[in-house]
Amino acid sequence: MTGSSPSAGPLQMKDKFTDSGKLIFLCAYAIKKSFLQETIMANQSVTPADIFADLLRFRAPAAIAWVRGGDAAPNLSGLVKFYQTPYGGVLVEAEIFNLPNKQVPGSTDFYAMHIHQNGDCSDDFAKTGDHYNPSGKPHPDHAGDLLPLLGNEGYAWLSFYDKRFSTDDIIGRSVVIHSHADDFTSQPAGNSGTKIGCGVIEKADYLKV
């Protein structure tokens, strides 16, 4: 199948509609009811996947991170959302635009994504600190070691369930995207290369659902 990858990033939407970009861009999450909610009492075979799909389609995230590129990838932008689930863990959804392989037709490259200790994306992301690792475990068992992004001609979308942290644990920290894949072996950070994108994780309590 051929076709061009998505190119309009969420930061463009953020800048266009409001100063904060939050209310209008995310207003689709202010839906009170979903088909799943209306039928869940009658259907006892609802799976976690059904719940997760409902969260992504109809619910407001508990926290978000607007991701922007640094000197190495100035056009990179994206949005990472964190949903607290009824199972104790967090559903993570990431959508990233203009990854470095955007200019290579048909290219697919992996990019490491981690939660870092500090919520400071200044100075070309030099102040984000180490991976979020409250239990002091070796890499890749840090609570902040997330699944890698698969960039398809510069665009990546990813969603996964993670029970190593809650949304309250990570608010005020940062999501960092790296120039290379995480090898899940090298210490202390998986030999993931340069930091090319960063976003501070903030509470999304301005959304009323």
For each of these PLM feature ranges, what is it?
Residues G3-P6:
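Short, positively charged low-complexity motifs
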Residues G9, K16-F17, K22-F25:
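N-terminal amphipathic/hydrophobic targeting modules at extreme N-termini
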Residues P10-L11, A126:
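Hydrophobic alpha-helical membrane context
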Residues L11-Q12, K208:
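N-terminal low-complexity, intrinsically disordered patches enriched in charged
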Residues A28-A30:
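Short hydrophobic alpha-helical segments enriched in small aliphatic residues
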Residues K33-V209:
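N-terminal leader/targeting pre-sequences
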